[in-house]
Amino acid sequence: MSAQIVPAPEHVCYVHCNFCNTIFAVSVPSNSMLNIVTVRCGHCTSLLSVNLRGLVQALPAEDHLQDNLKMHNMSFRENYSEYGSSSRYGRVPMMFSKNDTEHMLHVRPPEKRQRVPSAYNRFIKEEIRRIKANNPDISHREAFSTAAKNWAHFPNIHFGLGSHESSKKLDEAIGAPSPQKVQRLY
């Protein structure tokens, strides 16, 4: 009996995402080992172009490494020249073997910008502080409910006017004569 050696239908490559600093395993079909492929990171969903041509000998032979890695959800596409992607030459593909992953620097992902709180959130925060200052025994839930009712019942608060300022402005608006429409020719 002769044993047939069947070539492995897929190889496992290790790709480093520069955006979220994740290393993930990509299962590459054997017929695509000499192509440029595009993979999508399952963590940050960014697309990475990877040139597999020079990496045929550098691929790890151990199949048990695949079991030890946490697999991220990703998609795999071959990148042919008829797609006309000019971005594939601008990115530097990064593939790592087991030894290379130990020498990587820890790069933190960019931090999200802090958003400015809305007028509603600022009002609720200040109103809860005011309510709790007047009645320290009130629960936070009750103070929030009261603050939300105050926001709903006092529409002048929405524009940043205090209760004393709003009554003065309302009195001025009611007592002032209404503007007359005048047509002018320019």
Swiss-Prot record:
SUPFAM superfamilies: HMG-box (SSF47095). InterPro entries: HMG_box_dom_sf, YABBY, YABBY_C, YABBY_N. GO terms for molecular function: zinc ion binding. One of its GO terms (biological process) is cell fate commitment. One of its GO terms (cellular component) is nucleus. Expressed in leaf blades, leaf sheaths and flowers. It is found in: Nucleus. Belongs to the YABBY family. This is Protein YABBY 2. It comes from Oryza sativa subsp. japonica (Rice).
